[in-house]
Amino acid sequence: MSDLLNQFQSSSEEIRRAAITAASGSSDGEVVQALIRHLAEGSLSESERQLAAESLGKCTLPEIAAILLPMLAAESALTRTMAAAGLGGQQSAAAITALVSGLTDSVNTVRNWSERSLLGLISAVQQYGVESLIALLSHEVRLSRSPAARVLGLTQDERALSPLQLMAEKDSDWLARMAAIKALGDLGFPEALDLVTRALQSDPKNRVRAAAAEALGKLRPHNAEQLLRAALDTDEDEGLQKSAGEALRSLGFEVSAINDDGWE
């Protein structure tokens, strides 16, 4: 048995945690099995099991999915969370489908880890997950709609353009609108410019307007400087001003610095 595998069985949590960290991304079947056993060991601390899940999430051996996918349906929210984290290295259609479903989980940590894993698997999401993510944009729970939008933006898939525009314009929840506006910036299609500009100028929620400023910086319209400087001049919200200033800088324009008291 290798030294690393022996360290997994140490009575010292410090040594075990070091072994878990060293095993991150391993392609050794025995090491991966040790991580899986660690993840499932109920006598260990939650943080140690979570660390094992995160290390497992960087491993790409396909047999991991067969073990973890059923765990996403477990009664224990902690088990579902660790399964979502541990699937972070799996690029199969089954893994992507399961992680997209994880965005609808009733527990926040499961949703968060499902999103985090999907964000690290964008090429596989492009292949297997776009349609199911689009379907989630109309989910009744905003905390499922928002992460679906964020992941979709990074796919840069044209199929997401119209659904994200509809969400950005019509969703009654500002968190969902903010996610959709940000996603439109990441998506990168100029067809979204008019909607993003309207959001910058007139959305009632300051954080949506700030997201629109960020999105304009990514979409890079010919009049970006004019739009962003107008927002700086007319919108007193500091979050919006910070986003507009950062967008201007990203486009190569000079802008005053911002400090804790506002713009200098």
Can you name each region flagged by the protein language model?
Residues 1-7, 28-40, 61-73, 92-104, ...:
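Amphipathic alpha-helical scaffolding segments comprising HEAT/armadillo-like alpha-solenoid repeats
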Residues 182, 186-246:
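Ankyrin-repeat and related helical/solenoid repeat scaffolds used for protein-protein interactions
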Residues 17-18, 33, 46, 50-54, ...:
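Alpha-solenoid HEAT/ARM repeat scaffold
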Residues 13-14, 29, 44-47, 62, ...:
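Alpha-helix N-cap/helix-start positions at coil->helix boundaries
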Residues 14-26:
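Alpha-helical segment of the N-proximal tetratricopeptide repeat
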Residues 46-123:
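A generic tandem-repeat structural signature
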